[in-house]
């Protein structure tokens, strides 16, 4: 599921080199434009890939970046954990929205913290599973997204009972069926997932502040050299107010 001026341009020398490497015209026109492969999973409202739609906060932002840099974008839809593997192998160029971790930095470069932070919420159905403090998590079965990172203490806590699923929608269905007692998710992703599968949930009073998430580039990708240009365009989008408008748009959609 998809947060300066407009005079952002590629350095001439890089543009000429890229034309040879990618078969693109030096002026960055549509003829022979480079194609950037982006690994994505369906996770509204950030990345929406459903019934032929390709939208969402993260996708809309990256599409704007690609358009300004003269790139074509090809989205490859796979589960979140699979995207991480494809980034390691260099089989996709870009990943949208990972949080920064030391392990991931070995195989992906973090171009820019493009997307706003979101609280980590703890969803539940039965009153006894309400989380008021971190210690309430012990002894409960907790649903988490495969390959996701939430916050350091939680991620490294081997005493917690965690069950995984490839999508937040799956986790909400597991919650409904009693297979897990709590689901942890970024705020908008969790709310959207519960609504999408029509599962009634409650939100615990305990939450954890989120981190900004990133546009990341595989270290094996030829577009790694354009990390600075991506960051410049994202800053332009932010300065122009487009980022804020997109965040507001998708935040409103998520909570309707």
Predicted segments with their positions:
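Extended ligand-binding regions for polar small-molecule ligands
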Residues: 59-68, 128, 135, 140-141, ...
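Periplasmic-binding protein-like
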Residues: 40-42, 117-121, 195-231, 253-256
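Acidic, polar ligand-binding/catalytic clefts
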Residues: 63, 75-136, 147-148, 204-209
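Bacterial N-terminal signal peptides
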Residues: 11-20
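Bilobed "Venus flytrap"/periplasmic-binding protein-like clamshell domains
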Residues: 41-44, 52-64, 126-159, 164-166, ...
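Short helix-initiation/N-cap motifs at beta->coil->alpha
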Residues: 74-85, 163-173, 177
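Ligand-binding clefts/hinges and TM-proximal coupling segments of bilobed small-molecule sensing domains
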Residues: 23-24, 149-163, 203-205, 234-256
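Extracytoplasmic small-molecule ligand-binding "clamshell" domains
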Residues: 25-102, 106, 144
């Amino acid at each position: 599921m998809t947060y300066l001026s407009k005079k952002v341009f590629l350095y001439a020398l890089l543009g000429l080199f890229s034309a040879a490497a990618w078969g693109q015209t030096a002026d960055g026109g549509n003829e022979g434009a480079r194609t950037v492969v982006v690994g994505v999973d369906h996770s509204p409202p950030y990345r929406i890939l459903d019934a032929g739609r390709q939208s969402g906060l993260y996708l809309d932002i990256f599409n704007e970046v690609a358009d300004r840099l003269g790139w074509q974008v090809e989205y490859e839809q796979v589960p979140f954990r699979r995207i991480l593997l494809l980034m390691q192998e260099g089989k996709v160029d870009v990943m949208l929205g990972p949080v920064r971790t030391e392990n991931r930095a070995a195989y992906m470069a973090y171009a820019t913290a493009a997307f706003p932070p979101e609280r980590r919420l703890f969803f539940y159905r039965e009153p006894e599973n309400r989380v008021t403090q971190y210690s309430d998590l012990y002894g409960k079965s907790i649903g988490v997204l495969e390959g996701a990172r939430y916050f350091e203490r939680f991620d490294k806590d081997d005493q917690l009972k965690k069950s995984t699923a490839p999508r937040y929608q799956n986790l909400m269905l597991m919650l409904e069926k009693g297979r897990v007692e709590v689901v942890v998710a970024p705020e908008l992703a969790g709310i959207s997932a519960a609504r999408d599968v029509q599962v009634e949930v409650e939100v615990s009073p305990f939450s954890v502040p989120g981190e900004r998430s990133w546009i990341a580039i595989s270290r094996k990708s030829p577009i790694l050299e354009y990390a600075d240009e991506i960051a410049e365009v994202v800053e332009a989008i932010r300065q122009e107010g487009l980022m804020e408008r997109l965040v507001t748009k998708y935040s409103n959609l998520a909570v309707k």
